[in-house]
Amino acid sequence: MSGAEEAGGGGPAAGPAGSVPAGVGVGVGAGPGAAAGQAAAAALGEAAGPGLPDEAGLAGARQLQLQEAAGDPDAPPKKRLRAAEAAEAAAAAAAAGSGKLEERLYSVLCCTVCLDLPKASVYQCTNGHLMCAGCFIHLLADARLKEEQATCPNCRCEISKSLCCRNLAVEKAVSELPSECGFCLRQFPRSLLERHQKEECQDRVTQCKYKRIGCPWHGPFHELTVHEAACAHPTKTGSELMEILDGMDQSHRKEMQLYNSIFSLLSFEKIGYTEVQFRPYRTDDFITRLYYETPRFTVLNQTWVLKARVNDSERNPNLSCKRTLSFQLLLKSKVTAPLECSFLLLKGPYDDVRISPVIYHFVFTNESNETDYVPLPIIDSVECNKLLAAKNINLRLFLFQIQK
């Protein structure tokens, strides 16, 4: 026991409230702990005055003690490290307590997973912990990939689309919190920020009106008029513009070719479509893998099955931030002649997932009755997580039989 501890614990009765026993930090053996005690006593005395120590005084004394412990060369390294971390946390807490109300609300209303303010829907578990829509869907998708029950990262209660509900009060409160424009750095309510950044901000990034003839300029809106007055593209010769336009037309041609192909397929004699429901299953391997399969369905008087896999059945898809789905079409019935088909998958009538149409072709025979795995053309990993978070994946399959 140090001299400070002996004086604090075994001395005579304490003096008036707010005073410090005279023996604190005095006597043989008083070292760095005594300095911490004196600093704490000073903080308590200044904050509380003649009355009892208030909360601010106690917090200040605690922070000074932690700083002294962190700087004590005789303390064990682990203790110094813990004290330094605790001092930083105490300083952050003190700073947060003295900030504006909206700044303190950020930590109250933020998502418990990404620690950011939700941009759209806010979900809560049965104990009230908040999750933004993106993180909520991602938790459900990860649980599906790992064959586990999804749980709240805070309280570990079970979460699902049926157990969790939206918190409209938090959504409205977040929409009224001020947020900084990324261009002009002014503060606006979050509900008005998107409109400001798209239509009103003078510093928003915009494009030249001559981009249709190849001008690549991007810049702030308040410089647009000056640039367009000096833009060189309107004065280019016809041959120069033709070279630029040829490159711009290539992507447009590919898109038009795709839609023309779809229109041509719609004129075929034998066309079939059906709603398909991919259901999750697990392989029988030692390390199971998630895959999806539909019940058998009949289209064009034939029996079919669809299968799908995540990230091409990689070992740990839950460790990857990029999520993809690929699928294959299997013919389950026997055919007397080769069956040449075109097929494509689109979103179902009640889903909001974004899928780009891609046409695939295959000739089915009794010996070759399944296609290779082909990519499901989902826009990005966020849309893929939406599908994985659902109990089942509902899509619409179109089949076109090619007759010769």
From Swiss-Prot:
Q: Does the keyword Iron apply?
A: no
Q: Which keywords has UniProt assigned to this entry?
A: Cytoplasm, Metal-binding, Zinc, Zinc-finger
Q: List the GO terms this entry assigns under cellular component, sorted alphabetically.
A: nuclear envelope; nucleus; perinuclear region of cytoplasm
Zinc finger (TRAF-type) stretch: 152-225
Gly residues biased stretches: 1-13
Pfam families attached to this UniProt entry: Sina_RING (PF21362)
User: What residue ranges carry the coiled-coil annotation?
Assistant: none
**Molecular function per GO:** zinc ion binding
Q: Does the keyword Zinc-finger apply?
A: yes
Q: Which segments carry the region annotation Disordered?
A: 1-22
Q: Which PANTHER family match?
A: CYSTEINE AND HISTIDINE-RICH PROTEIN 1, ZINC FINGER TRAF-TYPE-CONTAINING PROTEIN 1
Q: Per the similarity annotation, which family is this?
A: Belongs to the ZFTRAF1 family.
What does the subunit section of this Swiss-Prot or TrEMBL entry state?
Interacts with LGALS3.
Q: What is this protein called?
A: Zinc finger TRAF-type-containing protein 1
Organism of derivation: Homo sapiens
Gene encoding it?
Answer: ZFTRAF1
